[in-house]
Regions:
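Nucleic-acid endo/exonuclease domains
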Residues: 1-120
Length: 120
């Protein structure tokens, strides 16, 4: 599945890349509202995906512009968000847009194993 072959349903409140991540989570056996939630409000902003199964995981989609134009300040903000969530026992995995659209099932599988491939 690629971004160009993905049809985002009307009413989806998020990016196409986030919808691809959502679909990959479902294909990985995760059930919405039971295992994970999309776009909940968390302290300090919004994290795209939080989980009840496993409860110590969160994922954030980094959109294309963000991925290509991030500098040290943006990475510092990401590291701060990761540290804040880590203080609550939650691992935040960043999902880079380009990697997500190339192979969403692989990237989500890696994220579910707590493997963060951002900034590689």
């Amino acid at each position: 599945m690629t971004l160009s072959s993905t049809k985002v349903p009307e009413g989806w409140q998020g990016s196409e890349a986030a919808y691809m991540a959502f679909g990959a989570l479902v294909r990985a056996g995760k059930e919405p509202r039971r295992d994970f939630s999309y776009a909940p409000r968390m302290e300090g902003g919004t994290v795209d995906f939080t989980f009840t199964n496993p409860p110590d995981l969160a994922m954030q989609v980094q959109e294309s512009f963000y991925s290509h134009h991030s500098g040290i300040e943006t990475r510092g903000t990401d590291m701060l968000a990761k540290a804040q969530l880590a203080g609550r026992g939650i691992t935040l995995i960043m999902l880079e847009h380009d990697k997500l659209i190339q192979d969403p099932d692989w990237l989500i599988g890696e994220a579910l194993r707590y493997r963060d491939h951002s900034w590689e």
